[in-house]
Amino acid sequence: MKKIDKRKKYVLVIDVETANTIIDSKFNDGLVYDIGFGVYDKKGNEYVAKSWTIKEIFDKEEELMQSAYYAWKLPRYYEELKNGTRQTMTIKGAKKYIAKVMETYNITEVYAYNAKFDKQTLDNTIRFVTKSKERYFFPYGTEIKDIWNMACCVLCTQKTFLKQNIRNDKGNFITNAERVFGYISCQSDFEEDHIGLQDVRIEAQILAKCFAQHKHMETNPYHANWRLPRKKYEEMVA
């Protein structure tokens, strides 16, 4: 860990990869098998970076793991575990470790791209493993903030982004982390790794770019702002 400058404000950026159960298709019932997180200041400087596979899911739920959206990446995980470049942690151990890091850096804000997903699946996992004896992954009072909403407010409404006019089949602008990082880094063919820590570092740079705009941003993970770019574009060409 770098020396802590107590004059700075630090935030935690987290990203998870999940496998899906079939408990209830009406809500997100994914369970986390990969956690990556880092501690950053508002300029995107990194102070802590960690990544784990979660033992109770990755090691003990073999059938479930085959449902993982990126199951084809599993051989990479096995190789990294074998050569020692990746570690395994229990979900309770991960929770305790992250809480300690947050205490050390006086962190009260956790950021993620589509943060509702990360929070829900982390809570799902701690409840699944502890049989609901523990119900929440982050310490009480933690503010969960959404980088996606922030990016939609201040990056994806920029004229240069809108003029690129990259949309999905429904006519909405593509605003996922892969697309936004490609935009701010001028890499039109950028592809996200979809491995916890690697994605964290990308999302931390998007977050820093958002902060650098010095504009009002929506951070609530339960408010959807992905329609904003289309609305802004329609105003621009009217």
Regions found by a protein language model. Give the residues of each.
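Conserved non-catalytic scaffold segment of RNase H-like nuclease domains
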Residues: 2-119
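Active-site-proximal flexible loops/turns
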Residues: 22-24, 60, 121, 125, ...
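Short helix-coil transition/hinge motifs at the ends and kinks of transmembrane helices
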Residues: 62, 129-138, 160-167
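Short, polar/flexible loop-turn hinges at active-site or ligand-entry regions and domain interfaces
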Residues: 81-85, 132-138, 187-192
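Acidic, Mg2+-coordinating catalytic module of metal-dependent nucleases/exonucleases
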Residues: 109-116, 120-121, 163-238
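Substrate-recognition/cap helix-loop segment adjacent to the acidic, metal-dependent catalytic center
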Residues: 116-145
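Short alpha-helix plus adjacent loop in nuclease-associated cores
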Residues: 144-168
